[in-house]
Protein backbone atom coordinates (compact mmCIF):
# COMPACT_ATOMS: atom_id res chain seq x y z
CA UNK A 1 0.00 0.00 0.00
CA UNK A 2 1.47 3.38 -0.95
CA UNK A 3 1.76 6.32 1.46
CA UNK A 4 -0.79 8.28 -0.60
CA UNK A 5 -3.36 5.49 -0.17
CA UNK A 6 -2.66 5.13 3.54
CA UNK A 7 -2.95 8.85 4.17
CA UNK A 8 -6.14 9.06 2.11
CA UNK A 9 -7.76 6.20 4.03
CA UNK A 10 -6.53 7.61 7.33
CA UNK A 11 -8.00 11.00 6.54
CA UNK A 12 -11.38 9.51 5.65
CA UNK A 13 -11.50 7.18 8.63
CA UNK A 14 -10.36 9.81 11.14
CA UNK A 15 -12.99 12.24 9.88
CA UNK A 16 -15.74 9.64 10.26
CA UNK A 17 -14.70 8.67 13.78
CA UNK A 18 -14.16 12.12 15.28
CA UNK A 19 -16.97 12.80 17.78
CA UNK A 20 -16.95 16.06 19.74
CA UNK A 21 -13.17 16.04 20.02
CA UNK A 22 -12.68 12.40 21.00
CA UNK A 23 -10.32 10.57 18.68
CA UNK A 24 -10.49 7.13 17.18
CA UNK A 25 -7.56 6.64 14.84
CA UNK A 26 -8.62 4.82 11.69
CA UNK A 27 -11.19 2.19 12.55
CA UNK A 28 -11.95 0.91 16.04
CA UNK A 29 -9.03 0.02 18.30
CA UNK A 30 -10.01 -3.64 18.27
CA UNK A 31 -9.57 -3.82 14.50
CA UNK A 32 -6.57 -1.63 13.84
CA UNK A 33 -2.96 -2.62 14.35
CA UNK A 34 -0.89 0.52 14.73
CA UNK A 35 2.32 -1.49 14.63
CA UNK A 36 1.56 -2.71 11.11
CA UNK A 37 1.37 0.91 9.96
CA UNK A 38 4.85 1.84 11.24
CA UNK A 39 7.29 3.10 8.60
CA UNK A 40 10.01 0.61 9.52
CA UNK A 41 8.98 -3.01 9.95
CA UNK A 42 10.61 -5.54 12.25
CA UNK A 43 11.62 -9.01 11.10
CA UNK A 44 14.50 -11.38 10.47
CA UNK A 45 14.86 -10.64 6.75
CA UNK A 46 15.16 -6.83 6.93
CA UNK A 47 17.56 -4.27 8.37
CA UNK A 48 16.22 -3.40 11.83
CA UNK A 49 15.88 0.38 12.21
CA UNK A 50 13.77 0.09 15.39
CA UNK A 51 16.61 -0.01 17.95
CA UNK A 52 16.59 3.41 19.68
CA UNK A 53 15.87 3.42 23.43
CA UNK A 54 14.14 6.39 25.07
CA UNK A 55 17.37 7.26 26.89
CA UNK A 56 19.30 7.45 23.63
CA UNK A 57 16.43 9.40 22.08
CA UNK A 58 16.70 11.91 24.95
CA UNK A 59 20.39 12.48 24.21
CA UNK A 60 19.66 12.86 20.50
CA UNK A 61 16.90 15.38 21.19
CA UNK A 62 19.28 17.28 23.48
CA UNK A 63 21.98 17.36 20.81
CA UNK A 64 19.50 18.41 18.13
CA UNK A 65 18.57 21.50 20.14
CA UNK A 66 21.74 22.13 22.17
CA UNK A 67 24.03 22.96 19.31
CA UNK A 68 25.52 26.02 17.67
CA UNK A 69 22.65 28.21 18.90
CA UNK A 70 24.52 28.65 22.20
CA UNK A 71 27.15 30.50 20.18
CA UNK A 72 24.53 33.04 19.03
CA UNK A 73 22.21 33.28 22.06
CA UNK A 74 24.47 35.48 24.25
CA UNK A 75 24.59 38.08 21.47
CA UNK A 76 20.80 37.90 21.15
CA UNK A 77 20.37 38.42 24.90
CA UNK A 78 22.74 41.38 24.84
CA UNK A 79 20.47 42.94 22.22
CA UNK A 80 17.21 42.61 24.18
CA UNK A 81 18.64 42.67 27.74
CA UNK A 82 19.08 40.02 30.43
CA UNK A 83 15.49 40.08 31.73
CA UNK A 84 13.91 40.51 28.31
CA UNK A 85 16.10 37.80 26.81
CA UNK A 86 15.40 35.39 29.68
CA UNK A 87 11.64 35.84 29.36
CA UNK A 88 11.75 35.35 25.59
CA UNK A 89 13.98 32.27 25.94
CA UNK A 90 11.87 30.63 28.67
CA UNK A 91 8.64 31.48 26.85
CA UNK A 92 9.73 30.08 23.51
CA UNK A 93 11.31 27.01 25.12
CA UNK A 94 8.08 26.18 26.97
CA UNK A 95 6.03 26.74 23.84
CA UNK A 96 8.36 24.62 21.71
CA UNK A 97 8.30 21.74 24.20
CA UNK A 98 4.49 21.82 24.24
CA UNK A 99 4.20 21.80 20.45
CA UNK A 100 6.82 19.01 20.32
CA UNK A 101 4.47 16.92 22.47
CA UNK A 102 1.62 17.71 20.07
CA UNK A 103 3.69 16.48 17.13
CA UNK A 104 4.76 13.29 18.88
CA UNK A 105 1.24 12.46 20.02
CA UNK A 106 -0.12 13.06 16.53
CA UNK A 107 2.58 10.89 15.00
CA UNK A 108 1.82 8.03 17.41
CA UNK A 109 -1.87 8.22 16.52
CA UNK A 110 -0.90 8.14 12.83
CA UNK A 111 2.26 5.94 12.80
CA UNK A 112 2.47 5.78 9.02
CA UNK A 113 3.63 9.42 9.19
CA UNK A 114 7.42 9.48 9.09
CA UNK A 115 7.97 13.24 8.94
CA UNK A 116 5.98 16.42 9.31
CA UNK A 117 5.31 16.42 5.57
CA UNK A 118 3.37 13.16 5.90
CA UNK A 119 1.33 14.67 8.73
CA UNK A 120 0.46 17.78 6.76
CA UNK A 121 -0.52 15.51 3.89
CA UNK A 122 -3.43 14.33 6.04
CA UNK A 123 -4.98 17.78 6.11
CA UNK A 124 -3.64 19.38 2.91
CA UNK A 125 -3.33 16.41 0.59
CA UNK A 126 -0.46 15.55 -1.73
CA UNK A 127 0.35 19.16 -2.66
CA UNK A 128 0.68 20.17 0.98
CA UNK A 129 2.84 17.16 1.72
CA UNK A 130 5.26 17.98 -1.09
CA UNK A 131 5.46 21.68 -0.16
CA UNK A 132 6.19 20.90 3.49
CA UNK A 133 8.73 18.30 2.36
CA UNK A 134 10.59 21.02 0.46
CA UNK A 135 10.47 23.21 3.59
CA UNK A 136 11.99 20.40 5.65
CA UNK A 137 14.92 20.13 3.27
CA UNK A 138 15.37 23.92 3.11
CA UNK A 139 15.38 24.20 6.92
CA UNK A 140 17.97 21.48 7.41
CA UNK A 141 20.21 22.89 4.67
CA UNK A 142 20.08 26.38 6.21
CA UNK A 143 20.95 25.07 9.67
CA UNK A 144 23.62 22.78 8.25
CA UNK A 145 25.04 25.80 6.41
CA UNK A 146 25.19 27.67 9.72
CA UNK A 147 27.12 24.75 11.19
CA UNK A 148 29.50 24.62 8.22
CA UNK A 149 30.18 28.35 8.56
CA UNK A 150 30.76 28.03 12.32
CA UNK A 151 33.06 25.02 11.90
CA UNK A 152 35.06 26.98 9.32
CA UNK A 153 35.45 29.77 11.89
CA UNK A 154 36.75 27.20 14.38
CA UNK A 155 39.26 25.76 11.91
CA UNK A 156 40.42 29.29 11.11
CA UNK A 157 40.89 30.01 14.81
CA UNK A 158 42.79 26.78 15.49
CA UNK A 159 45.15 27.26 12.54
CA UNK A 160 45.59 31.05 12.72
CA UNK A 161 43.98 31.26 9.28
CA UNK A 162 46.52 28.99 7.61
CA UNK A 163 44.25 28.39 4.60
CA UNK A 164 41.61 30.22 2.59
CA UNK A 165 38.33 30.24 4.52
CA UNK A 166 36.58 28.60 1.56
CA UNK A 167 38.90 25.59 1.95
CA UNK A 168 37.94 25.32 5.62
CA UNK A 169 34.28 25.59 4.64
CA UNK A 170 34.69 22.74 2.18
CA UNK A 171 36.48 20.62 4.79
CA UNK A 172 33.66 21.35 7.24
CA UNK A 173 31.02 20.28 4.72
CA UNK A 174 32.90 17.03 4.05
CA UNK A 175 33.14 16.22 7.78
CA UNK A 176 29.46 16.99 8.35
CA UNK A 177 28.43 14.86 5.37
CA UNK A 178 30.56 11.95 6.58
CA UNK A 179 28.75 12.13 9.92
CA UNK A 180 25.29 12.44 8.37
CA UNK A 181 25.94 9.40 6.18
CA UNK A 182 25.76 7.06 9.20
CA UNK A 183 22.67 5.12 8.19
CA UNK A 184 20.55 4.61 11.33
CA UNK A 185 19.75 6.81 14.31
CA UNK A 186 20.79 3.98 16.61
CA UNK A 187 24.36 3.99 15.30
CA UNK A 188 24.36 7.77 15.07
CA UNK A 189 23.22 7.79 18.70
CA UNK A 190 26.52 6.35 19.91
CA UNK A 191 28.57 9.19 18.45
CA UNK A 192 25.89 11.65 19.58
CA UNK A 193 26.84 10.87 23.18
CA UNK A 194 30.43 11.82 22.35
CA UNK A 195 29.28 14.94 20.51
CA UNK A 196 27.04 16.07 23.36
CA UNK A 197 29.84 15.64 25.90
CA UNK A 198 32.56 17.39 23.88
CA UNK A 199 30.34 20.30 22.87
CA UNK A 200 29.08 20.82 26.42
CA UNK A 201 32.61 20.66 27.85
CA UNK A 202 33.83 23.15 25.24
CA UNK A 203 31.03 25.58 26.12
CA UNK A 204 31.74 25.15 29.85
CA UNK A 205 35.46 25.85 29.32
CA UNK A 206 34.57 28.99 27.39
CA UNK A 207 32.06 30.09 30.05
CA UNK A 208 34.56 29.60 32.89
CA UNK A 209 37.24 31.40 30.88
CA UNK A 210 35.17 34.57 30.41
CA UNK A 211 34.39 34.67 34.15
CA UNK A 212 38.12 34.73 34.95
CA UNK A 213 39.02 37.64 32.66
CA UNK A 214 39.59 41.12 34.04
CA UNK A 215 37.66 42.48 31.10
CA UNK A 216 36.14 41.08 27.88
CA UNK A 217 38.71 40.17 25.24
CA UNK A 218 37.20 42.63 22.75
CA UNK A 219 37.29 45.58 25.17
CA UNK A 220 40.16 48.08 25.32
CA UNK A 221 43.09 46.46 27.20
CA UNK A 222 43.66 49.58 29.33
CA UNK A 223 41.53 52.25 30.94
CA UNK A 224 37.86 52.29 31.80
CA UNK A 225 35.26 50.59 29.63
CA UNK A 226 31.49 50.21 29.66
CA UNK A 227 30.40 46.56 29.97
CA UNK A 228 27.05 47.46 28.43
CA UNK A 229 25.03 45.04 30.59
CA UNK A 230 21.34 45.90 30.80
CA UNK A 231 18.23 44.23 32.16
CA UNK A 232 15.84 45.41 29.45
CA UNK A 233 17.10 46.92 26.20
CA UNK A 234 15.19 48.76 23.51
CA UNK A 235 16.49 47.57 20.13
CA UNK A 236 14.95 48.56 16.83
CA UNK A 237 12.50 46.27 15.07
CA UNK A 238 15.00 44.66 12.68
CA UNK A 239 17.66 43.91 15.31
CA UNK A 240 15.07 42.86 17.87
CA UNK A 241 13.34 40.42 15.51
CA UNK A 242 16.62 38.82 14.40
CA UNK A 243 17.57 38.36 18.07
CA UNK A 244 14.14 36.97 18.96
CA UNK A 245 14.39 34.54 16.05
CA UNK A 246 17.72 33.28 17.40
CA UNK A 247 16.18 32.78 20.86
CA UNK A 248 13.24 30.97 19.27
CA UNK A 249 15.07 28.64 16.93
CA UNK A 250 17.41 27.29 19.63
CA UNK A 251 14.67 24.95 20.92
CA UNK A 252 12.52 24.64 17.80
CA UNK A 253 13.93 21.37 16.48
CA UNK A 254 10.88 19.28 17.34
CA UNK A 255 10.13 18.42 13.71
CA UNK A 256 13.49 16.60 13.71
CA UNK A 257 12.33 14.41 16.59
CA UNK A 258 9.73 12.71 14.39
CA UNK A 259 11.98 10.41 12.33
CA UNK A 260 13.66 9.35 15.58
CA UNK A 261 10.27 8.17 16.89
CA UNK A 262 9.98 5.90 13.86
CA UNK A 263 13.23 4.23 14.94
CA UNK A 264 12.43 3.95 18.67
CA UNK A 265 11.86 0.51 20.18
CA UNK A 266 8.81 1.93 21.96
CA UNK A 267 7.42 5.05 20.27
CA UNK A 268 5.12 5.37 23.32
CA UNK A 269 8.16 6.54 25.34
CA UNK A 270 8.52 9.67 23.20
CA UNK A 271 6.87 12.00 25.72
CA UNK A 272 9.33 11.00 28.42
CA UNK A 273 12.33 11.64 26.18
CA UNK A 274 10.90 14.93 24.89
CA UNK A 275 10.20 16.37 28.36
CA UNK A 276 13.61 15.43 29.74
CA UNK A 277 15.36 16.91 26.71
CA UNK A 278 13.35 20.13 26.95
CA UNK A 279 14.21 20.56 30.63
CA UNK A 280 17.92 19.85 30.17
CA UNK A 281 18.40 22.03 27.10
CA UNK A 282 16.32 24.91 28.45
CA UNK A 283 18.34 25.07 31.66
CA UNK A 284 21.67 24.85 29.82
CA UNK A 285 20.76 27.67 27.44
CA UNK A 286 19.40 29.96 30.15
CA UNK A 287 22.19 29.53 32.71
CA UNK A 288 25.14 29.54 30.31
CA UNK A 289 23.94 32.45 28.19
CA UNK A 290 23.22 34.64 31.23
CA UNK A 291 26.65 33.93 32.73
CA UNK A 292 28.36 34.70 29.43
CA UNK A 293 26.39 37.94 29.05
CA UNK A 294 27.11 38.94 32.65
CA UNK A 295 30.87 38.87 32.04
CA UNK A 296 31.04 39.93 28.38
CA UNK A 297 28.20 42.43 28.15
CA UNK A 298 28.00 43.92 24.69
CA UNK A 299 31.59 42.86 23.92
CA UNK A 300 30.46 39.62 22.35
CA UNK A 301 31.51 37.90 19.16
CA UNK A 302 29.35 35.72 16.93
CA UNK A 303 30.14 32.84 17.29
CA UNK A 304 30.60 33.54 21.01
CA UNK A 305 33.88 31.61 21.47
CA UNK A 306 35.74 34.61 20.03
CA UNK A 307 34.90 36.51 23.23
CA UNK A 308 37.25 34.37 25.35
CA UNK A 309 40.52 35.71 23.94
CA UNK A 310 42.97 34.00 21.56
CA UNK A 311 44.05 31.10 23.82
CA UNK A 312 40.69 30.02 25.21
CA UNK A 313 39.02 30.59 21.86
CA UNK A 314 41.31 27.90 20.45
CA UNK A 315 40.82 25.61 23.45
CA UNK A 316 37.03 25.96 23.30
CA UNK A 317 36.89 25.30 19.56
CA UNK A 318 39.34 22.42 19.85
CA UNK A 319 37.18 20.65 22.43
CA UNK A 320 33.77 21.42 20.95
CA UNK A 321 34.38 21.01 17.21
CA UNK A 322 33.61 17.25 17.23
CA UNK A 323 30.31 17.96 18.96
CA UNK A 324 29.51 20.78 16.56
CA UNK A 325 30.20 18.60 13.52
CA UNK A 326 28.16 15.71 14.92
CA UNK A 327 25.26 17.98 15.87
CA UNK A 328 25.13 19.55 12.42
CA UNK A 329 25.47 16.08 10.92
CA UNK A 330 22.22 15.09 12.66
CA UNK A 331 20.41 17.97 10.95
CA UNK A 332 21.66 16.89 7.54
CA UNK A 333 20.88 13.26 8.41
CA UNK A 334 17.23 14.15 9.07
CA UNK A 335 16.87 15.86 5.69
CA UNK A 336 18.62 12.98 3.95
CA UNK A 337 16.51 10.39 5.78
CA UNK A 338 13.33 12.19 4.71
CA UNK A 339 14.36 12.19 1.04
CA UNK A 340 15.64 8.60 1.32
CA UNK A 341 12.37 7.26 2.74
CA UNK A 342 10.38 9.40 0.32
CA UNK A 343 12.17 7.84 -2.66
CA UNK A 344 12.41 4.20 -1.53
CA UNK A 345 9.28 3.76 0.58
CA UNK A 346 7.21 0.67 -0.30
CA UNK A 347 10.20 -0.88 -2.10
CA UNK A 348 12.52 -3.71 -1.06
CA UNK A 349 15.46 -1.30 -1.28
CA UNK A 350 14.36 0.67 1.81
CA UNK A 351 15.56 -1.92 4.33
CA UNK A 352 17.90 -4.12 2.29
CA UNK A 353 21.59 -3.60 1.50
CA UNK A 354 21.20 -3.24 -2.25
CA UNK A 355 23.19 -1.05 -4.63
CA UNK A 356 20.13 1.17 -5.05
CA UNK A 357 19.80 1.48 -1.26
CA UNK A 358 23.39 2.63 -0.74
CA UNK A 359 23.62 4.70 -3.91
CA UNK A 360 20.47 6.63 -3.02
CA UNK A 361 21.52 7.19 0.58
CA UNK A 362 25.07 8.38 -0.15
CA UNK A 363 23.99 10.41 -3.18
CA UNK A 364 21.39 12.34 -1.17
CA UNK A 365 23.91 13.11 1.56
CA UNK A 366 26.45 14.35 -0.98
CA UNK A 367 23.85 16.60 -2.64
CA UNK A 368 22.69 18.13 0.63
CA UNK A 369 26.26 18.63 1.87
CA UNK A 370 27.11 20.45 -1.35
CA UNK A 371 24.04 22.69 -1.02
CA UNK A 372 24.90 23.54 2.61
CA UNK A 373 28.46 24.47 1.60
CA UNK A 374 27.22 26.83 -1.12
CA UNK A 375 24.75 28.55 1.24
CA UNK A 376 27.42 28.86 3.97
CA UNK A 377 29.76 30.62 1.56
CA UNK A 378 26.99 32.92 0.30
CA UNK A 379 25.82 34.06 3.79
CA UNK A 380 28.70 33.19 6.16
CA UNK A 381 27.24 34.72 9.36
CA UNK A 382 25.65 32.38 11.90
CA UNK A 383 22.92 34.57 13.39
CA UNK A 384 21.59 35.56 9.95
CA UNK A 385 21.42 31.93 8.81
CA UNK A 386 19.64 30.90 12.00
CA UNK A 387 17.26 33.84 11.72
CA UNK A 388 16.47 32.98 8.11
CA UNK A 389 15.86 29.34 9.04
CA UNK A 390 13.63 30.43 11.90
CA UNK A 391 11.54 32.70 9.70
CA UNK A 392 11.05 30.44 6.71
CA UNK A 393 10.71 27.04 8.35
CA UNK A 394 11.12 26.75 12.12
CA UNK A 395 8.18 29.02 12.97
CA UNK A 396 5.74 27.06 10.77
CA UNK A 397 7.15 23.72 11.94
CA UNK A 398 7.12 24.51 15.66
CA UNK A 399 4.17 26.88 16.04
CA UNK A 400 1.78 26.84 13.08
CA UNK A 401 1.71 23.24 11.82
CA UNK A 402 1.47 21.53 15.25
CA UNK A 403 -1.57 23.63 16.10
CA UNK A 404 -3.21 22.87 12.76
CA UNK A 405 -2.63 19.16 13.39
CA UNK A 406 -4.07 19.44 16.89
CA UNK A 407 -7.14 21.22 15.50
CA UNK A 408 -7.49 18.51 12.85
CA UNK A 409 -7.65 15.73 15.44
CA UNK A 410 -9.70 17.76 17.95
CA UNK A 411 -12.03 19.45 15.49
CA UNK A 412 -14.99 18.83 17.77
CA UNK A 413 -13.50 21.12 20.43
CA UNK A 414 -14.43 24.14 18.31
CA UNK A 415 -18.08 23.68 19.28
CA UNK A 416 -17.64 21.60 22.44
CA UNK A 417 -17.70 22.55 26.12
CA UNK A 418 -16.39 25.88 27.40
CA UNK A 419 -13.04 24.33 28.37
CA UNK A 420 -12.74 22.60 25.00
CA UNK A 421 -13.47 25.83 23.14
CA UNK A 422 -10.88 27.63 25.28
CA UNK A 423 -8.30 24.97 24.37
CA UNK A 424 -9.15 25.35 20.70
CA UNK A 425 -8.77 29.14 20.94
CA UNK A 426 -5.36 28.83 22.62
CA UNK A 427 -4.07 26.75 19.72
CA UNK A 428 -5.40 29.29 17.24
CA UNK A 429 -3.47 32.02 19.11
CA UNK A 430 -0.25 29.97 19.06
CA UNK A 431 -0.62 29.58 15.30
CA UNK A 432 -1.08 33.35 14.97
CA UNK A 433 2.13 33.91 16.95
CA UNK A 434 3.81 31.66 14.41
CA UNK A 435 2.47 33.72 11.51
CA UNK A 436 3.83 36.89 13.12
CA UNK A 437 7.25 35.24 13.55
CA UNK A 438 7.28 34.22 9.88
CA UNK A 439 6.42 37.67 8.51
CA UNK A 440 8.35 39.80 11.01
CA UNK A 441 11.51 37.72 11.08
CA UNK A 442 11.68 37.21 7.31
CA UNK A 443 11.50 40.97 6.78
CA UNK A 444 14.05 41.69 9.52
CA UNK A 445 16.59 39.10 8.35
CA UNK A 446 16.42 40.23 4.72
CA UNK A 447 17.00 43.85 5.78
CA UNK A 448 19.85 42.81 8.12
CA UNK A 449 21.61 40.78 5.40
CA UNK A 450 21.25 43.68 2.95
CA UNK A 451 22.77 46.05 5.53
CA UNK A 452 25.61 43.58 6.20
CA UNK A 453 26.59 43.57 2.52
CA UNK A 454 26.33 47.37 2.32
CA UNK A 455 28.48 47.90 5.43
CA UNK A 456 31.11 45.35 4.42
CA UNK A 457 30.33 42.96 7.29
CA UNK A 458 29.81 40.41 4.52
CA UNK A 459 32.44 41.45 1.99
CA UNK A 460 31.62 39.03 -0.81
CA UNK A 461 30.54 35.46 -1.38
CA UNK A 462 33.17 32.68 -1.30
CA UNK A 463 35.53 35.01 0.57
CA UNK A 464 38.99 33.74 1.57
CA UNK A 465 39.42 36.35 4.33
CA UNK A 466 39.76 35.27 7.97
CA UNK A 467 36.40 35.19 9.77
CA UNK A 468 37.66 34.21 13.22
CA UNK A 469 39.46 37.38 14.28
CA UNK A 470 42.72 35.44 14.57
CA UNK A 471 44.78 37.57 12.17
Swiss-Prot record:
Domain of life: Eukaryota
Glycosylation sites: 20, 160
Record localization: Membrane
Expression induction or repression: Expression is induced in response to 2-benzoxazolinone (BOA) exposure.
Membrane topology category: Multi-pass membrane protein
Matching InterPro entries: AA_transpt_TM (IPR013057)
Residue span of region Disordered: 1-24
Outcome of gene disruption: Does not affect 2-benzoxazolinone (BOA) degradation.
Residues annotated as transmembrane: 70-90, 131-151, 162-182, 190-210, 229-249, 273-293, 315-335, 362-382, 385-405, 429-449
Pfam families referenced in this protein's UniProt entry, alphabetically: Aa_trans
UniProtKB keywords: Glycoprotein, Membrane, Transmembrane, Transmembrane helix, Transport
GO molecular function: L-amino acid transmembrane transporter activity
Predominant subcellular localization, coarse grouping: membrane
One Gene Ontology cellular component annotation held by this UniProt entry: membrane
Role of this protein: Transmembrane transporter; part of the Fusarium detoxification of benzoxazolinone cluster 1 (FDB1) involved in the degradation of benzoxazolinones produced by the host plant. Maize, wheat, and rye produce the 2 benzoxazinone phytoanticipins 2,4-dihy-droxy-7-methoxy-1,4-benzoxazin-3-one (DIMBOA) and 2,4-dihydroxy-1,4-benzoxazin-3-one (DIBOA) that, due to their inherent instability once released, spontaneously degrade to the more stable corresponding benzoxazolinones, 6-methoxy-2-benzoxazolinone (MBOA) and 2-benzoxazolinone (BOA), respectively.
Family: Belongs to the amino acid/polyamine transporter 2 family.
More details: Fusarium verticillioides possesses 2 unlinked loci, FDB1 and FDB2, necessary for detoxification of antimicrobial compounds produced by maize, including 2-benzoxazolinone (BOA). The FDB2 cluster arose as a duplication of the FDB1 cluster with rearrangement and expansion by incorporating additional genes.
Name of protein: Transmembrane transporter FVEG_08292
Organism: Gibberella moniliformis (strain M3125 / FGSC 7600)
Lineage: Eukaryota, Fungi, Dikarya, Ascomycota, Pezizomycotina
